[in-house]
UniProtKB/Swiss-Prot annotation:
The organism's taxonomic lineage, starting at the top: Eukaryota, Viridiplantae, Streptophyta, Embryophyta, Tracheophyta
Organism encoding this protein: Mesembryanthemum crystallinum
Pfam families for the chain: 14-3-3
Biased composition (Basic and acidic residues): 246-264
Family: Belongs to the 14-3-3 family.
Gene transcribed to yield this protein: GBF
Protein name: 14-3-3-like protein
Superkingdom assignment: Eukaryota
Region (Disordered): 239-264
PANTHER family noted in UniProt: 14-3-3 PROTEIN
Role, per record: Is associated with a DNA binding complex that binds to the G box, a well-characterized cis-acting DNA regulatory element found in plant genes.
Length: 264
């Protein structure tokens, strides 16, 4: 079998796995495709499939971690030490899985995806992805490991931002998605609500001023992310926003609905 037909076969299998909601296998198929691209970069469709696969695999564990951490806090406040030690052990198991998933995509980004990226769009996409997965590590790591993960997140997002501001339109969905996730990083990880709000507001205002230039292709994607930016701004600036009362929005992986056409 030629490498081209093998690549097509893996892409098709990834699509099947997505439909079946077997995201671990979807990751495996798309990793094979990514490793075939030593010089040639992934197509937009392949890039989006890889993103969706990893976002679903990590998303399930992030949700589990949040639930378990919440239960742990409640048990601690009740003084149930036996339960707390059991929960801590279980949380550790989830954290091991989270670390493994993040390490997998970060290694792939470093070894194949970022070096082979040739367009501004793909460079921003992969650097944003690098920032996202370092941020997911920072969500649960502690001490020096958390500090390192946060620093790596900041470096990746800043590198992506430098290219995005110079090369992509303010209405470009990838530039908007970067602003959304970068602002979430400032708010949640660095505990800098002012920076988070400034970044989100600037991205929103710049996109609004150029909304009439949007083609039909990306109108839906761009306006959806703009709505998420506005939702977060509303949450962050409301005086009576209780912590955890609302969910902070992030850029979803493309094609998560299974119906949406991938952004070109």
């Amino acid at each position: 079998m030629s490498s081209e037909s093998s690549r097509e076969e893996n892409v098709y299998m990834a699509k099947l796995a997505e439909q079946a909601e077997r995201y671990e296998e979807m990751v495996e198929f798309m990793e094979k495709v990514a490793k075939m691209t030593d010089t040639e970069e992934l197509s937009v469709e392949e890039r989006n499939l890889l993103s969706v696969a990893y976002k679903n695999v990590i998303g399930a564990r992030r949700a589990s971690w949040r639930i378990i951490s919440s239960i742990e806090q409640k048990e601690e406040s009740r003084g149930n030490e036996d339960h707390v030690s059991t929960i801590k052990e279980y949380r550790g198991k989830i954290e091991t899985e989270l670390s493994k998933i993040c390490d997998g995509i970060l290694n792939l980004l470093e070894s194949h995806l970022i070096p082979s990226a040739s367009t501004a769009e793909s460079k921003v996409f992969y650097l944003k992805m690098k920032g996202d997965y370092h941020r997911y590590l920072a969500e649960f790591k502690t001490g020096a490991e958390r500090k390192e993960a946060a620093e790596n997140t900041l470096l990746a997002y800043k590198s992506a931002q430098d290219i995005a501001l110079a090369e992509l339109a303010p209405t470009h969905p990838i530039r908007l998605g970067l602003a959304l996730n970068f602002s979430v990083f400032y708010y949640e990880i660095l505990n800098s609500p002012d920076r988070a709000c400034n970044l989100a507001k600037q991205a929103f205002d710049e996109a609004i001023s150029e909304l009439d230039t949007l083609g039909e292709e990306s109108y839906k994607d761009s306006t959806l992310i703009m709505q998420l930016l506005r939702d977060n701004l509303t949450l962050w600036t409301s005086d009576n926003a209780e912590e955890g009362g609302d969910e902070i929005k992030e850029a979803a992986a493309k094609r998560e609905s299974g119906e949406e056409k991938p952004q070109q």
